[in-house]
Amino acid sequence: MPQDDDWFWGRPTPVVVGDGETTSKPKPPVAGKTKKVEEQHPRRPGEPDCSYYVKFGSCKFGISCVYNHPDPRPQHGADDKKPAEQFPRRPGEPDCSYYVKFGSCKFGMNCRFNHPPRMPVPPQQEYFSGNACHCHHIEGKSKVEQVKLNVLGLPLRPGTGLCSYYMNRGICKFGTNCKFDHPDPGSDHEKWVVSSNANQVSSQVNIYSVLDHGESNEHTFTSEEVHQPGIPSFHQRISYTRDQLLQLCQNVEVPKDILKFCQDINVELNGEDKISGFGAEKDHVQTPSYKRFDATDSRDWHSWSAQTNWEQKFWDNFSEAKEPYSLGWKQEKFNKPDQSSFHFDSKDQWLKFIKCTPCKSTLIKAEVPLSIQRGIISGKDEVLKTLKSILNTFSPKMFDLQKGQLIETRISSADILKDVINLIFEKVVAEPAFCSTYAQLCTYLNQNLTPFPPEDCDCEEITFKQALSNKCQEIFESAHTVCSEIGKLIGQDREMEQRDKERVVKLETLGNINFIRALLKKKLITNKIIDHIVQAVMDCCKFRFEPLGKVDLLNIIFEGMLDSDSAGDESNICVNAMIGGNKSSIASNDVEMTRKNVNRQNEEAILQKSYDEVPNNKMDPQKNYADGAISYLIEKEKPTNLESSVRICRGGCSISEIMELVVDAGAVEGSDEHFMATLLFIKPEYREIFLTLDTREGRLGWLKRMYKVKE
């Protein structure tokens, strides 16, 4: 029957295997039960252990495995060490590093190294974690001492000293891990704990009496509970009602310094010599409003400020004074130690002091304050300020909108008109890309601005066109003066200054010429300005570091004037003369060609002849030599001279013929000069310039300079 019971409950039945060895043979499970049958492995003492079973805890051969399958459960009290024979000891050989680290060796008895005996590890004392153990742990002792706890759950350690944190606050942040003593509140130390907490509560009361708490809190403590820190609720935050705070406010004695300070503040703000709040007398206690922003201010600030308007001006003048003013006031203050500190009991005393005390610092104050100076702006400055704001945002897209704004600025005098033209020229130099737009703006102003009366009664009325022409002439005359000053800068120590000035003058000259070219198209200035342009270019060509070459001159003039209908015969002849100078044994690539090759002996005669032949004596005898040289070139120029006349030889050669001349000049195909020629000769004006150069060196040099300019 026992076997039947085992079969019924699903227990394995012992089975004899081999040499009297017993094992358990599982019975088939009862129907309706899903319990998994544990896999069985034979135990064979004396046989080597099954390595697969030892490593993974199972064996695929099961009950038929011929090796031993030890019990995986540890046996308490048994020696778990492996036999010493498994790891050989070889004195004199180095120790097996793997055995020393891990206590085992995979080679076993076949290892060639020494396996020293391992030192037994003493059993370590294990304790609970600090938060879980309630015992007192003493280092160096294996015996555990039980620690008692007080009513608050803190350890009692007599003889180790009192916990200062606990004695001051009634709690301990270290809890059961604290190494000091925490006596019960009812012990001999109760008086000390109660007195310390009473001081803490009184300090909190002083703080809460000043602050504004509004309505009372729901959870409150009585006075008895406040002075009993031993109860568990004492760890929570202490709260008070408004009545308790007011009662404490009346009982607490406020220091006299604080009362005096509050009195001074009330005098400054309210103008009343009263003390309100917790510092008032007990018989006349005024309950302040504990709603900080609910009460409305009933004081008449407007009438008070109107009555003391002069006082406000005094403080304005004081704040607007500069640093010397303030330093002088401070020096005067420190020189008189009896007046170094002032105390006013009321507003009337303060006003009386201001009226009676002489202020010497007002003697050095400016007659017109800075705030008033800022408000006084002349009509001219206001107009110029408006014009600058408009021109700073000037663009072709906004032209239609901004041109009307310029007219609305009320340009009402000749001085304002000159300043407007100066602003336009400054913007042109800074933004040369908008030259055509600014020329269009000048046309609009010329049409819509009425003439202005002259400064002198004998002169004619000043128009916009006349003022613009005068400005152009002044620009080139001043540029000529600057160029002459730059030529006087000699020495290595002034090379940087000379270079910077040359660059500035060159950029200004190019910007002004571009703008004048656009004005010539609009017929706003006469062609006489061409003489000044040529003179300015010749002056810039003398620069040492930033010279303005002939290529720049030709590009500027030909792009704007040559195809323009506004440019008359005079300007065209002038341009042709400068180009045709290359044919008359003059340096082809130098703008100063006339100054180097004209016969000096006939120079004065040529200038006098050109001056006599000019009708109405338009040419000034004090003109520079460049004007005479250009007149000489104009006289030599003939309309039938096809080689020097740009207009007659226009389009005379095809592009293929000109490219042959380019190759013949030394610009091999694939070079930078040949590439630049293919880009430039699409336009007829560049082909005409190239044909006027008669030497190969001159043509090749012209292409090289054009390549540098385009870069």
From Swiss-Prot:
Residues 1-49 are annotated as: Disordered. Keywords: DNA-binding, Metal-binding, Repeat, Zinc, Zinc-finger. It holds the Pfam family zf-CCCH. Residues 384-637 form the MIF4G domain. It comes from Oryza sativa subsp. japonica. One of its GO terms (biological process) is translational initiation. SMART domains: MIF4G, ZnF_C3H1. It comes from the Eukaryota. GO terms for cellular component: eukaryotic translation initiation factor 4F complex. One of its GO terms (molecular function) is zinc ion binding. This is Zinc finger CCCH domain-containing protein 43. Residues 35-47 have a biased composition (Basic and acidic residues).
